[in-house]
Regions:
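Extracellular acidic, Ser/Thr/Pro-rich low-complexity tracts
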Residues: 2-6, 128-135, 245-253, 292, ...
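Recognizes extended acidic, P/S/T-rich segments that occur
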Residues: 44-46, 277-278, 358-412, 482-533
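Residue-level recognition of secondary-structure-to-loop junctions
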Residues: 51-61, 65-69, 179-182, 190, ...
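Short, solvent-exposed loop/turn segments at the edges of extracellular beta-sandwich modules
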Residues: 74-79, 193-204, 306-314, 424-430, ...
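Extracellular interdomain linkers/hinges and stalk-like, low-complexity segments
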Residues: 84-134, 199-251, 312-341
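Strand-loop-strand motifs at the edges of beta-sheets in extracellular beta-sandwich domains
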Residues: 156-180, 269-291
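Pro/Thr/Ser/Gly-rich low-complexity, intrinsically disordered linker/stalk tracts
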Residues: 322-358, 413, 426-483, 532, ...
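Beta-strand-rich modules
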Residues: 404-430, 520, 526-548
């Protein structure tokens, strides 16, 4: 606020949006102006003071609440706000308390709105907002509000001149006014919206903050400093990220760099930014030692501010970049053929012991070739373009096995299959993909090779079925030591292409595998069928000592209708 004593509040009133309010004492600064309990605030320039008011309020239950504060009055003579001296200053935060969304913290605004503008030069402001819960933030311009939060009649966005712009970047939050036309005071406002994805995958509004700022525009011969572009980055949890920030000034002024954002407000270790004011060009070093507790789906925004030292009016520039902290992958993935199924097993990732945003499950992906795929630095999970498809997910962090049954249909003999596994966290963040394994099914179950209609009839039709026996004494054969006999094959069928109940029509049992291997006849002809009107589907199940080994992939008779 300005330094005017009339506007200096030792206490102020906050309205909680549930029909209640509280008078809150100022809580920062010394005790000279507001004895005996309130404090004085902290001057941050000759004309600006930082005042903090802190209180606690408990809501009665779920709902949506507007938390607001009103303060009379705005300065007189604000150019884009008529009769400004009689318009109250109003700000609000919108809070959604919901059973689906869980605990919620409002975004933190780390850069105060204290910069000035200059006629003919772009004015920039960025609040340096970040959200500790990892909620997504978006930004939009709005009108300044008055009594009751109603937009002030006659308010207008500031003039920009022909071809100029006044906007806010909806992602980075940088407000740009290019360029101010007239000296004087202006009031600007924007909203920072907070979004969270629900169980249906839809983003829902869980809160917003209204920032209202005063900008004093003067005249100067200064030019804005320029921060060089900074690329977004993904980093494996547990490693150190370091970024060098560079800024220049067209006038050769001394530049001061500062940084704010998510990495400065997280659980330790927090980020550091080292830079000293210097004549253009100037550099700063951002560094952050990430740990497992920093893993989350949403990136961490970091906003850099550069301000020059022009003696008339200092101008600024902002740049925002994002850091995504990615979880390490599950390790030691193995794939073991089991009949026409494949059993996957892996070890937990190194970050499995964290609480809060913890591992909820693992998801397994498959494709039908052995071509390798390696993720890019910012590719988490398994993208669709890789050709991998989701096989299934486990139910917990401790469940580190999954059997791929291909939906119960079994996998194809003679096909190479590749697998990857990914850890999925509470906020749906995905780890990097695991090591890729490739495997081919063993020939340890029979394989159907013929299902042919021999006779077409509505009642006396027949179908010929033929299969290949399981192999012995090859690298992909049945392990008879691990799976001793007796051995049994069951041929079953059902009417149609999809059914849950099979009828067994042929069984053969042998004490030793040699008996299976020596079978001369591996065919069966089923009669008494309606092959004119119905298709028939067949499968062969194979057992060792009563243990189900697997099934031949199902096959159906040709049926034209």
């Amino acid at each position: 606020i300005g330094s005017s004593g009339l506007a200096d509040r030792c206490e102020d009133t906050v309205y909680f949006g549930d029909g209640t309010r509280a008078v809150v004492l100022r809580s920062n600064g010394g005790t000279t102006l507001c004895p005996p309990t309130a404090r004085d605030g902290v001057p941050i320039s000759t004309t600006i003071k930082l005042n903090e008011y802190i209180t606690t309020h408990t809501y009665g239950g779920p709902g949506s609440y507007k938390i607001s504060m009103t303060d009379p009055n705005r300065n007189a003579g604000v150019i884009n706000l008529p009769n400004s001296v009689n318009q109250v200053f109003y700000i609000e935060s919108y809070l959604v308390i919901s059973t689906f969304s869980g605990p919620n913290s409002s975004p933190i605004l780390s850069f105060p709105p204290i910069d000035k503008g200059c006629v003919g030069h772009c004015f920039y402001h960025n609040p340096g907002a970040y959200d500790l819960d990892g909620d997504s933030l978006s930004y939009e311009l709005t009108d300044c509000r008055g009594t009751g939060g109603i937009p002030i009649a006659g308010y207008s966005y500031p003039a920009t001149g022909g071809g100029g712009t006044y906007n806010i970047n909806s992602i980075s939050g940088t407000l740009s006014w290019c360029v101010p036309q007239l000296q004087g005071e202006y009031n600007l406002a924007f909203i920072i919206k907070e979004w969270r994805k629900n169980a249906d995958g839809e983003y829902k509004l869980v809160g917003y903050i209204l920032r209202d700022l005063q900008v004093d525009v003067g005249t100067c011969l200064n030019d804005n400093p320029v921060i060089q572009p900074i690329s977004d980055t993904c980093v494996l949890a547990g490693t150190v990220i370091s970024k060098t920030v560079r800024a220049t000034d067209p006038d050769g002024d001394v530049i001061t760099l500062s940084a704010n954002g998510g990495p400065f407000g997280v659980t330790a270790p927090i980020a550091t930014f080292a830079s000293s004011p210097g004549i253009s060009p100037v550099t700063g070093i951002f560094q952050w030692n990430t740990v497992c507790a920093h893993i989350r789906k949403a990136p961490y925004p970091v906003t850099i501010k550069a301000i020059d030292s022009d003696p008339s009016i200092s101008l600024v520039d902002f740049k925002t970049f994002n850091i995504t902290v990615v979880a390490p992958p599950p390790t030691s993935l193995t794939a073991t053929p089991l009949g026409t199924f494949i059993k996957l097993r892996w070890n937990k990732p190194s970050c499995h012991q964290i609480t809060g945003n913890k591992i909820e499950k693992y998801c397994v992906y498959r494709k039908a070739d052995c071509n390798p795929w390696n993720h890019a630095p910012c590719e988490t999970g398994v993208p669709a373009y890789t050709g991998f498809v989701l096989v299934g997910c486990t139910s917990s962090m401790n469940d580190t096995t999954l059997i791929d049954t291909n939906g119960g249909a079994g996998l194809a003999q003679g096909t190479n299959y590749s697998y990857l596994v990914v850890a999925v966290f509470t906020d749906n963040a995905e780890s990097y993909a695991s090591n890729q394994v490739c495997v081919q099914l063993k020939r340890d179950v029979p394989v159907l090779i013929n299902v042919d209609v021999k006779t077409t009839s509505t009642s006396t039709g027949s179908i010929f079925v033929r299969w290949i026996k399981p192999l012995l004494n090859t690298s992909t054969a049945l392990d008879t030591v691990a799976l001793p006999g007796p051995y049994e094959m069951k041929l079953s069928y059902y009417n149609g292409f999809a059914a849950s109940t099979y009828t067994t029509i042929y069984t053969v049992t042998k004490t030793y595998f040699a008996g299976i291997n020596q079978l001369a006849d591996t065919t069966f002809t089923q009669t008494g069928l309606n092959t004119s009107d119905l298709p028939y589907t067949y499968k062969i199940d194979f057992y060792a000592n009563g243990t189900f080994i697997g099934s031949a992939q199902k096959a159906s008779s040709v049926f034209l209708k």
